[in-house]
């Protein structure tokens, strides 16, 4: 989910809320989200002919398949700043399970353009990267929609499994133009439970006090270069054009 809070209620088409005191007392919550993210990445890579080969390789190396794919992308790109450009000819509309926000249409379906007669690990890596980028562009769409209704979101405080994947995090920063703040403690639910415990025990009087004392930023990931920004601006136009074409059909 993509959650933002404000002192005033904001009604945003395609975004859930506003909900009063849902996260913090006396604040209003809006929540946007995508219908499938991690599940979409898994679906794309597990559907590829090379999946079992790379999964076996990953297990033999004591790694996850995502680590193997990330290493392959780095090798293909040569430089970390060039990874994003590997998919200049591949684009994905990530609505494989409909769209939750901001289009709010569960009947939508996904699409991939740029496929070839290829069964190589490199082709699987490209599809994996293009999926991450499509999800990141979906996040950009949600942020833009929320910013048009009073928010000024320029920073994402990230949590969840995706934060453990450096390419997932970097491409979200690149696609959205936002700084990605990664928490020092990766298990957000456990930390939140501990904060509630300290308030119940009287250690802190308010949630903001507990949050300030117990939550720390471990790492900040920022957008890479202006060249990458321009590239993602073009991919974002394609993202919307694919949807418009989809609606024609």
Residue ranges and their predicted role:
Residues 1-159, 164-249:
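Active-site core segments that coordinate phosphate-bearing ligands/cofactors
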């Amino acid at each position: 989910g993509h959650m933002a809070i404000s002192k005033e209620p904001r009604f945003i088409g395609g975004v859930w809320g506003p909900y009063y005191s849902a996260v913090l007392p006396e604040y209003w919550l809006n929540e946007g989200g995508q219908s499938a993210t991690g599940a979409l990445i898994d679906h794309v890579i597990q559907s590829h002919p090379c999946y079992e080969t790379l999964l076996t390789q990953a297990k033999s190396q004591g790694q996850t398949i995502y680590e193997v794919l990330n290493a392959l992308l780095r090798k293909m790109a040569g430089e970390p700043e060039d990874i994003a450009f590997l998919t200049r000819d591949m684009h994905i509309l990530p609505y494989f399970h409909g769209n939750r926000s901001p289009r709010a249409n569960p009947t939508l379906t996904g699409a991939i353009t740029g496929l070839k007669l290829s069964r190589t690990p490199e082709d699987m890596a490209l599809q994996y990267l293009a999926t991450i980028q499509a999800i990141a562009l979906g996040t950009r769409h949600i942020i833009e929609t929320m910013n048009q209704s009073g928010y000024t979101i320029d920073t994402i405080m990230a949590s969840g499994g995706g934060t453990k994947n450096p390419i997932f995090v970097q491409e979200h920063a690149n696609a959205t133009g936002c700084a990605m703040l990664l928490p020092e403690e990766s298990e957000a639910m456990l930390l939140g439970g501990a904060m509630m415990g300290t308030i119940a025990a009287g250690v802190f009087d308010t949630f903001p006090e507990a949050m300030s004392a117990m939550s720390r930023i471990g790492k900040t990931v920022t957008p890479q270069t202006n060249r990458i920004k321009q590239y993602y601006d073009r991919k974002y136009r394609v993202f919307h054009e694919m949807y418009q074409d989809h609606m024609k059909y």
